[in-house]
Design a protein with these regions (language model features):
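Active-site pocket scaffolds in enzymes
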Residues: 122
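C-terminal nucleotide
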Residues: 1-116, 126-158
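A short, basic/aromatic helix-end/turn motif that makes direct DNA contacts
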Residues: 119
Length: 158
């Protein structure tokens, strides 16, 4: 992937909670290679064609250095994840801490959007910040007010 000339400023947040990754993956894998109910068909479609399109759109946003679009795509991806995955394993995918971070008003002012990382749940979140100063402010807020560990990551730039 060609990296943008202007960096994208991301913040990775460790939610500091436990999750059962094997259970989460097992619940999603039941929809493959074929599925026999509406919930499974939603997961199958979401992890197939829908996800391919979203990833292609995200690659375009990264190449263009378009943080606002990337943030919106991440937010939309999380909403789709919630719609499709949560019914498969509510105990793991409801993720109240993740959703509290993603819905935090202070972070919303500093970030274009975000989503969970990996197979979801209460592991980590990634946020696309509006700029470097916003990322630094978001990191300070996450550490001092939310009491969570976080790490800034720049993608691209020279």
């Amino acid at each position: 992937i060609a990296l943008p000339k202007m960096p994208l400023h991301l913040l990775v947040v460790d939610l500091g909670k436990d999750k059962d990754t094997p259970l989460m993956l097992k619940s999603l894998q039941r929809s493959f290679p074929c599925c026999d109910d509406d919930c499974g068909r939603r997961v199958h479609s979401w992890l197939g064609e829908e996800n391919q399109q979203r990833v292609a759109d995200a690659v375009k946003a990264v190449r263009a250095g378009d943080a606002e679009t990337l943030g919106a795509l991440m937010t939309a991806a999380q909403k789709d994840f919630d719609r499709c995955a949560t019914p498969e394993c509510p105990s793991q995918f409801k993720a109240p801490t993740l959703h509290a971070v993603l819905g935090d008003e202070t972070l919303a002012e500093l970030c274009w959007g975000g989503k969970g990382i990996g197979c979801g749940g209460e592991g980590s979140a990634q946020l696309v910040c509006r700029d470097e100063a916003a990322r630094d402010s978001a990191a300070r807020y996450v550490r001092e007010e939310l009491g969570m560990w976080c790490c800034g990551v720049d993608v691209g730039g020279s």
